[in-house]
């Protein structure tokens, strides 16, 4: 396909990050002002210029004030495929106000300008600054429509409150794929009102009738606090109608400018139907913990490890060392991070935590302030079949990391544990319990600070049931559940990662931090919601019970009764009272495990882990 020059320009600017776009438009704007003052002078006075320095001063002042004003309005990185008429008006007022302010200052010291000259300068500057932005918007819109992506779909918006108003604020621009036909709201009394010129047609109870009448193809939910049962009801109605259902992006991402409410709509996901509200934690003390520091993450290519890297990057550390055994996953997260965040030195390191000498060499070379230990084998049935690998990675590997932290004098280590470490009947949980003992044991004798963070299942991680259910649904079913009674605690990947980072900030003396994760979720209910999300019914995608697998528990626990204490470091985060064992005793036990294999090793690790779970 032959590309035009405009296509290449659009592609080039689209790959720029926010700071680069600011520089791009800043350079263009100052050139526009320079050209404007030259043209204004030629038109007003002819070609003779008696005082060029004065005009340089005036242009510099005008540009400075203009940048301050559009920066205040958040337009200094404006690429106009998202611009609205109000943005163009702000640019006009910015040029006018900055020009008059500069004129007032210059007139007091350099009374060379007439007000008519300034008026001409304002008109030319505004024209030259707005012209490329408007042209950009028109070209981008034309390309979208020409590609076939710009086909407008007849759409209902659900929500006539604050969320709906935020959606409408950015809905009207040329790249929108929507033809917004009407708005529905839970409150039927709003019927007949208008929001952004679009009528409220009724309650979303009327969705089936109204969708057929208006030939609706898409529904977008713009109620941030919508109850999960209401989400399910809307989804069920949409599925019966054959209508696609989406949601508006999170309000905070819209306010921060990360998404456009009226265009960046998203698929409804399982977190919306589970109704678990993500815990928002106080980040005030994290700056001192992370900013300007070197941070090392083991297992940086995994679901949790990579998200820890993203979360830590928000606090502008000097360097993040991405340590992992899988070169492909480290490669992917490395390139994602350098694309998203600037000014941080990302160092990809391929290393195995079972290789102590390599770990120590990396730790001594980069001298991290904190090590987040996310590397582990986490799949319960796989570890039941491979107990030796679980021992080598989860126990020996954690020991190596903790020992290297001590030897390299790293100030702090945060280890990720699991609720499966509580009364573990399986190898994976037992090895993570022993890993907790290793961390608390090193904390007793080392100058470094160690802690562990214990939480439940993570939605969407590579080891969770979500990808399995998605694959089974895509294949036409059935969806397999081991036991319809089975329950698990769930949290999102970002939430789990935030907990890990906060635990590091509060760690003082070998604590095991435990999150209050709310109510457990039935895996059977989770499967039903996944089928609903796919647009199918249980008659189309059956859910079958296949029996519990080796090492699985019906119900997970976050802590045993003897571990529960009232010590709450912050909302929803507790410190568990856990048993501590001298490191010498742990060393002896690890040497014993090294000589065992197969079922003998499995039973020995599980027995030892359960002996040490209860506080004496």
Predicted regions and their residues:
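N-terminal Rossmann/SDR dinucleotide-binding element
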Residues: 258-271, 275-367
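Hydrophobic/aromatic anchor residues within beta-strands of the central parallel beta-sheet
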Residues: 348, 390, 450-453
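Strand-loop microenvironment adjacent to phosphate/nucleotide-handling motifs in alpha/beta enzyme folds
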Residues: 21, 280, 285-289, 441-457, ...
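Proline-aspartate-enriched helix->loop->beta-strand connector
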Residues: 211, 215-217, 317-318, 363, ...
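Signature of alpha-helical transmembrane segments in polytopic membrane proteins
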Residues: 1-150, 240, 247, 371
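A solvent-exposed beta-alpha-beta segment
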Residues: 45-49, 139-255, 328-332, 339, ...
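Flexible, Lys/Arg-rich cytosolic regulatory linkers and terminal tails that connect or flank
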Residues: 2-7, 231-294, 406
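Conserved Rossmann-fold NAD(P)-dependent oxidoreductase catalytic core, especially the SDR/UDP-sugar
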Residues: 241, 256-257, 373, 377-436, ...
């Amino acid at each position: 396909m032959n590309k035009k020059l405009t296509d290449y320009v659009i592609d080039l600017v689209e790959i720029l990050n926010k700071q680069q776009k600011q520089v791009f438009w800043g350079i263009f704007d100052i050139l526009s002002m320079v050209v404007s003052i030259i043209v204004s002078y030629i038109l007003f006075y002819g070609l003779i210029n008696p005082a060029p320095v004065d005009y340089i001063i005036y242009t510099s002042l005008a540009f400075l004030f203009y940048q301050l004003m559009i920066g205040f309005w958040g337009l200094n990185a404006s690429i106009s495929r998202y611009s609205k008429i109000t943005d163009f008006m702000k640019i006009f007022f910015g040029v006018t106000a900055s020009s008059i302010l500069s004129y007032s200052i210059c007139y007091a010291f350099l009374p060379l300008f007439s007000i008519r000259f300034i008026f001409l300068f304002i008109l030319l500057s505004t024209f030259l600054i707005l012209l490329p932005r408007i042209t950009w918007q028109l070209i981008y819109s034309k390309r979208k429509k020409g590609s076939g992506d710009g086909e407008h779909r007849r759409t209902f918006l659900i929500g006539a409150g604050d969320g709906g108003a935020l959606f409408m604020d950015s809905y009207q621009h040329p790249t929108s794929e929507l033809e917004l036909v009407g708005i529905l709201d839970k409150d039927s009394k709003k019927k007949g009102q208008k929001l952004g010129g679009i009528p409220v047609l009724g309650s979303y109870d009327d969705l089936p009738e109204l969708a057929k009448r208006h030939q609706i193809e898409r529904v977008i939910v713009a109620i941030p606090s919508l109850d999960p049962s209401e989400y399910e009801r809307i989804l069920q109605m949409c599925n019966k109608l054959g209508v696609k259902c989406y949601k508006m992006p999170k309000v905070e991402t819209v306010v921060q400018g990360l998404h456009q409410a009226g265009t960046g709509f998203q698929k409804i996901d399982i977190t919306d139907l589970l109704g678990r509200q993500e815990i928002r934690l106080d980040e005030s003390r994290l700056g001192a913990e992370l900013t300007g520091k070197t941070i090392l993450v083991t297992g940086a290519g995994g679901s949790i490890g990579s998200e820890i890297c993203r979360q830590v990057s928000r606090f502008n550390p000097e360097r993040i060392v991405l340590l992992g055994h899988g070169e492909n996953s480290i490669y992917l997260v490395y390139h994602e991070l350098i694309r998203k965040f600037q000014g941080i030195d990302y160092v990809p390191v391929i290393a195995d935590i079972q290789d102590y000498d390599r770990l120590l060499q990396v730790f001594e070379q980069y001298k991290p302030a904190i090590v987040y230990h996310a590397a582990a084998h986490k799949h319960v049935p796989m570890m039941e079949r491979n107990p030796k690998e679980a021992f080598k990675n989860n126990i020996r590997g954690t020991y190596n990391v903790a020992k290297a932290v001590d030897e390299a004098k790293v100030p702090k280590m945060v280890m990720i544990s699991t609720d499966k470490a509580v009364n573990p009947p399986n190898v994976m949980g037992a090895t993570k319990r022993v890993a907790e003992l290793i961390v608390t044991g090193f904390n007793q004798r080392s100058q470094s600070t160690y802690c562990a963070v214990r939480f439940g299942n993570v939605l969407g991680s590579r080891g969770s049931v979500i990808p399995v259910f998605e694959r089974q649904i895509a294949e036409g079913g059935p969806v397999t559940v081991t036991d319809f009674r089975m329950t698990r605690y769930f949290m999102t990947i970002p939430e789990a990662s935030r907990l890990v980072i906060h635990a590091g900030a509060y760690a003082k003396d070998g604590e095991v931090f435990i999150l209050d994760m709310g109510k457990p979720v039935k895996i059977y209910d989770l499967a039903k919601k996944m089928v609903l999300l796919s647009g199918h019914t249980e008659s189309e995608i059956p859910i079958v019970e296949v029996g519990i697998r080796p090492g699985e528990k019906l119900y997970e626990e976050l802590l045993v009764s003897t571990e529960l204490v009232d010590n709450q470091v912050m909302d929803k985060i507790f410190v568990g009272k856990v048993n501590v064992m001298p490191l010498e005793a742990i060393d002896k036990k690890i040497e014993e495990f090294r000589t065992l294999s197969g079922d003998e090793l499995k039973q020995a690790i599980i027995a030892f882990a359960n002996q040490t779970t209860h506080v004496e």
